[in-house]
Amino acid sequence: MDGSGPFSCPICLEPLREPVTLPCGHNFCLACLGALWPHRGASGAGGPGGAARCPLCQEPFPDGLQLRKNHTLSELLQLRQGSGPGSGPGPAPALAPEPSAPSALPSVPEPSAPCAPEPWPAGEEPVRCDACPEGAALPAALSCLSCLASFCPAHLGPHERSPALRGHRLVPPLRRLEESLCPRHLRPLERYCRAERVCLCEACAAQEHRGHELVPLEQERALQEAEQSKVLSAVEDRMDELGAGIAQSRRTVALIKSAAVAERERVSRLFADAAAALQGFQTQVLGFIEEGEAAMLGRSQGDLRRQEEQRSRLSRARQNLSQVPEADSVSFLQELLALRLALEDGCGPGPGPPRELSFTKSSQAVRAVRDMLAVACVNQWEQLRGPGGNEDGPQKLDSEADAEPQDLESTNLLESEAPRDYFLKFAYIVDLDSDTADKFLQLFGTKGVKRVLCPINYPLSPTRFTHCEQVLGEGALDRGTYYWEVEIIEGWVSMGVMAEDFSPQEPYDRGRLGRNAHSCCLQWNGRSFSVWFHGLEAPLPHPFSPTVGVCLEYADRALAFYAVRDGKMSLLRRLKASRPRRGGIPASPIDPFQSRLDSHFAGLFTHRLKPAFFLESVDAHLQIGPLKKSCISVLKRR
């Protein structure tokens, strides 16, 4: 039956049944609209699926629109049916189904269904048909981006038969059809803008993106799928770098926690010792007070008893004399003699009160200790929190250095031949910063650099070297231990560190790596290794090694260079200021290079440092090592 007639439903291609007129003027069967929008409801527009739209013109309906039967059109259809068999398209009973019928479309697959649903992966719930009755929905075969609904093979029939629906875009079943619509125009996303890298509908393509390079989504997907392997490879590399960075950060966190626990234990132990010393001093002072009190009380109480006894004897002798009868001369003489003897026995001066209590000076001694302790606590706290008085920063006291020496195993590993795995715990990923590269340096990604004869037109940058063929690594270092490796491919090269705030516009004689107090390096001059700092050079007797390890130790203010061979690390030179001997005598008074280190090297660590590289000869070429436990790959000369 031709579905283009004025009295036919564009969905089922049958004569209109219970006709409903939409605001745009198009007519549909009420049951067909209910089957097309089961998730919106047959009697209203809007809902969780988004704004309803006309299946023909795609005009959206206003929220809350109630679909009602068009009585005039219904009566016109009845009159048309009664005018004769030649005028009506079919018998009358087929035109008036019950309004309560859930759907006018068949609910079972027909033999002529356009396609069958593909099997879904095990354990995954398939997308259900939106036109099937609720509770008995079949798996969907396709989703319509125009109708915003999914259909099983049976309910896809109208999209195959109706000319008005054949232009709808059918895609494999989608769970969230709303994500395939333009949020602004509520139209299907069918185009891709390569300029702004967004998916567009036709309205967006004709308005905001006019003049941009627009391609179909399928074409862009095919192109992006070809690049997918490169993107995934880059993602894997970045994840590896992040994994190394995460491991390094975790080691730093663990180091901070362990150092804090150890320092907390040392402080608690020292405070306990100080408290024990104060407790012992308190016991001594209190004992001194008790001893002084007992001694002085013994003397005073003995004198008190003697005076009381003498007074008692005098009182008794006087009383006895007063009781002698006047006629008894013998008793009178005897009692008077006894009174005189008692008087003479105590007539000497007794000991007076003590002029000074010796134990009362105890409070003065304790007060002095308290005041000195308070002042010492304030001074030490200010020294602990305030900046150091010299450029070397906080240093260990000699007594603490003697009492708490550095771990011997770590010292031996850092200053002698050691397994490479030990240093990989401190691995740091170095990426070359193109904004610092001199115009005669060509970068290969972020890991390789080669000196060239023709200048490269780099963009202007305030951090770019202008007089020296140098380049820095990204990221500044200011604490902890860091290790990276450099592969010397060809030519004269230098590798080391440079202060972040060093001016890249310095002239050639002062701006080169190791020729100033703001940088130091290891140089390979084609014949031998040497180290440079503050304009002084110290030759090294070691043979050539194509792979050099660099270890920056902020805690010890040291920079070490190693030759890497077969998983072993051989120390080339460790740059560090020597500890002065007792009495202020320097450790190496006859070595000018070490003397320069002793006087200026620690000041380098007051700055944030960056990995630095200097390519001196015209054929110089180096590469940042991959820092993997497996053998380092041999790079071909470019």
UniProtKB/Swiss-Prot annotation:
The modification Omega-N-methylarginine is found at R582. Its EC number is 2.3.2.27. It holds the Pfam family zf-B_box. It is an enzyme of class 2 (transferase). Zn(2+) binds at C182, H185, C204, H209. GO terms for cellular component: cytosol; glutamatergic synapse; nucleus; postsynapse. A zinc finger (RING-type) spans 9-58. GO terms for molecular function: ubiquitin protein ligase activity; ubiquitin-protein transferase activity; zinc ion binding. PROSITE patterns: B302_SPRY, ZF_BBOX, ZF_RING_1, ZF_RING_2. The keyword Aminoacyl-tRNA synthetase does not apply. Keywords: Acetylation, Coiled coil, Cytoplasm, Metal-binding, Methylation, Nucleus, Phosphoprotein, Transferase, Ubl conjugation pathway, Zinc, Zinc-finger. Pathway: Protein modification; protein ubiquitination. It is found in: Cytoplasm; Nucleus. Residues 410-631 form the B30.2/SPRY domain. Residues 79-119, 300-322, 384-411 are annotated as: Disordered. It catalyses: S-ubiquitinyl-[E2 ubiquitin-conjugating enzyme]-L-cysteine + [acceptor protein]-L-lysine = [E2 ubiquitin-conjugating enzyme]-L-cysteine + N(6)-ubiquitinyl-[acceptor protein]-L-lysine. A zinc finger (B box-type) spans 177-217. SMART domains: BBOX (SM00336), RING (SM00184). The modification Phosphothreonine is found at T72. Residues 302-312 have a biased composition (Basic and acidic residues). E3 ubiquitin-protein ligase that mediates the ubiquitination and proteasomal degradation of CYLD. This is E3 ubiquitin-protein ligase TRIM47. The gene is TRIM47.
